[in-house]
Amino acid sequence: IIAAIYIFHKNEILKHNVGLKFFFIFALIVYFMNGIKPTEDAYWEDDLFWKSVRNTIILAFYSAYGVTFIAIIIAIATNKRGVTFTIIRTMFWATGGVGVVGLSLVFSQLFAPYASLVNNALEAFGFDAYPFTSKTNSGRFVIIFATVWWTIGLPIILFIAALQQIPDERYEAARIDGASNSQMFWYITLPGVSRIFLLVSVLQIIAHLQIFAQSQLLTGGGPDNNSRTLVQLIYEYSFRDMRMGSGAAVSVVLFLIIGFFTLSLIHISEPTRPLYISYAVFCL
């Protein structure tokens, strides 16, 4: 794909020949349509497929932007010198070293229906036990919470690195002019980390649209398939039901969804950038 994009925009013949451009684009469209065309059965009318698409987008949106916004807040709060803040940053960074299976098993014990650490704490304070992973909204919350806890380390480090590149003189000049903390955040801090904010957003969207183990191990895709994701559906089609064509088709759909959100973020952040460069960045 990268080679095709490069040839399309660098080759002088393709650049000036409308007919060849049309043929080139048509060939790429045919390639993708062959990929998303199911070979075993027409699952486009399958409610499970569309429910998996919706679940994937919901989980990815809340977990990706939950990570991004929480990470920037923690980065600002811990961007200070001292042993205490170094330890705190290390603790957040260390969460990424946990394997996803181990993470899922730990959170399954924390939020298991009725007999779990969280429910034991609720009962100790006089509340009834709650089946967290057996309800739609709370099951999604557990998956999002586990994913945010697991992936927040790298964004914090990236935001801290960006914050340390902002000159202190800007803050000093703003204080002299009487700027409040909120004004300094909106007009100095946020513009200073805007490029890292885009990078973190794109990386998190790409990663969280591929959620699998958390959904598989924490909720099993339930209840009523309301936490089943596209990657989970690919796994079930390909390796459980041996419907390799359907699994491959869903994987192409997932690729297109990731491409749509990634290119949208890149293009919104820099609308003057040629769109083909955004395509190349996405492919890389």
What does each model-identified segment do?
Residues 270-272, 277-284:
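Positively charged, low-complexity/disordered segments
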Residues 1-269, 273:
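A structural signal for multi-pass alpha-helical bundles of membrane permease subunits
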